[in-house]
Structures are given as C-alpha cells and as structure tokens.
C-alpha cells in the first residue's frame, strides 16, 4: 500500500454515499493528452475535452483531484471490450472461481455493464497541474484498471462522486507520484462502500489491504450504461 501522507484521510465522505452537490456527470470521446501520464508517472490517463457549455459546473468547482466511476464503450476489437473473446473468457473464469460479493453463487454470471459499456472505478484531475505549469485547464482521468490497449476516440462517461484534495505544486516527481498513488487508494476504499458502489451492475475494485472485490451497491449510476446519451454533462 502507498504511504499515507500527513493530514490525508484514508476515506472520503459518509458511508451512505455522495453528498450534494455530487455526483456530477461528464462525457465525451477520449482525446490524447500531454503524454506524460504513462511515460513519467507510470499512471496512464484518458483525457476528456473541458467544455463549459456541456458541463457548466466545471468552471466553478475547485481545481484538484476527484474520484468516482467511469464507463467505456470499447469496440469489440479491444481486448477489454465486454464482447471480446478474451474478456468473455476472463469473466467466465472469474465467475466460476468464486462467489460474487452480492451473494451470488459460484458460476453465476456477473453483469459488468450494459449496452456495450463497462464500469470501472476512477480518479481524475481537473485543473492546471501546477507541477507541469499548464496554462489550459484539463480533465485527466486515471481509470483504475489495467487495460490491454489504448482507447483514444472511445466514448467515456464519468460519474464524479466526490473531491479528494486540491491540486498543488511539488518539489519533485517522486512526491507527486506518492500523492497520486495515495489518491488512488483513497478512491478505491471510498468507492468500495455500499452507498458508493453502483446499483444494477457489478464492479471490480482492488481494495487496498483486502484484494479484488466484486461489488454491487445502492448508488444510482444508470446513466453510465444508458444508450445514446453522449454529450450529457449535467447533474
């Protein structure tokens, strides 16, 4: 597990779920970013365009690190697509190996998404990233899943459930990476609670100190897998 920095709580929010004004919604096609997430940080990001017209709330929220859920409509040719043969085989093996966290028995089929969308935990930065001296506000999403290939141009939807911390500058790259790694752990712990996990779909979260859990909670996240809603970015 990542080292816990001073004055950093391990969890965000009440166990019952996100509090107003959350959750926020954001969607778009994944675009190329600054190219440093994987190369310098070892933390790949999937960027979305920042559009004040589509997401009017984004200009008024603090710059910083947020967390929540991401859904991706990956093409069948992508190794992580819900319809790819590799993903289907992996899902079948996982379902046969152990019971689901929602009480399902061994061998029960898990519903990872719908309408081609799969749902994953995520942590994201909205802001200017002072360490890199950005002059344009960006939305950089780190989906908490190890993907077998890139997915530029794919539709991604975000349900932003809460705020972790404000952005800040760092004296060096190691300090930045340490904070990001702890952000990821905070997101995983927070999202693994019943009030924060999606209802209607099963999601996998690699909870620090506990391992991978398959969860189904009570948070309404139907928008993440609803068809034909690209461009919706409101509350």
Curated annotation (Swiss-Prot):
One record GO biological process: riboflavin biosynthetic process
Pathway: Cofactor biosynthesis; FMN biosynthesis; FMN from riboflavin (ATP route): step 1/1
EC primary class: transferase
One Gene Ontology cellular component annotation held by this UniProt entry: mitochondrion
Keywords: ATP-binding, Flavoprotein, FMN, Kinase, Magnesium, Metal-binding, Nucleotide-binding, Transferase, Zinc
Catalytic residues identified in the record: 140 (nucleophile)
Enzyme Commission code(s) on record: 2.7.1.26
Cofactor(s) the record lists: Zn(2+); Mg(2+)
Source organism superkingdom: Eukaryota
Cross-referenced SUPFAM superfamilies: Riboflavin kinase-like
GO MF annotation: an example: ATP binding
Cofactor binding mode and count: Zinc or magnesium.
UniProt KW Nucleotide-binding keyword: yes
Reaction(s) the record says it catalyses: riboflavin + ATP = FMN + ADP + H(+)
Binding site for Mg(2+): 45, 47
Family the UniProt entry places it in: Belongs to the flavokinase family.
Protein task: Catalyzes the phosphorylation of riboflavin (vitamin B2) to form flavin mononucleotide (FMN) coenzyme.
Designated name of the protein: Riboflavin kinase
Organism from which the protein derives: Chaetomium globosum (strain ATCC 6205 / CBS 148.51 / DSM 1962 / NBRC 6347 / NRRL 1970)
Annotated gene: FMN1
């Amino acid at each position: 597990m990542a080292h816990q920095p001073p004055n950093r709580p391990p969890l965000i929010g009440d166990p019952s779920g996100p509090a107003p004004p959350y959750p926020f919604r954001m969607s778009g096609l994944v675009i190329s970013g600054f190219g440093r997430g994987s190369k310098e940080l070892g933390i790949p990001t999937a960027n979305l365009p920042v559009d004040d017209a589509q997401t009017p709330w984004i200009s008024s929220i603090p710059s910083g690190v947020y967390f929540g859920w991401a859904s991706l409509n990956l093409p069948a040719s992508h190794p992580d697509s819900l319809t790819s043969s590799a993903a289907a085989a992996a899902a079948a093996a996982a379902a046969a190996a152990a019971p689901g966290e929602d009480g399902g028995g061994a061998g029960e089929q898990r519903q990872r998404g719908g309408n081609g969308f799969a749902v994953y935990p995520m942590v994201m930065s909205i802001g200017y990233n002072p360490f890199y001296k950005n002059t344009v506000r960006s939305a950089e999403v780190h989906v908490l899943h190890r993907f077998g290939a890139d997915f530029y141009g794919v539709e991604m939807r975000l349900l932003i459930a809460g705020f972790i911390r404000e952005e800040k500058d760092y004296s060096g790259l190691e300090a930045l990476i340490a904070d990001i790694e702890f952000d990821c752990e905070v997101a995983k712990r927070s999202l693994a609670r019943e009030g924060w996990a999606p209802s209607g779909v099963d999601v996998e979260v690699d909870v620090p100190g506990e391992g991978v859990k398959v969860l189904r909670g009570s948070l309404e996240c139907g928008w993440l897998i609803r068809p034909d809603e690209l461009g919706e970015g409101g509350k």
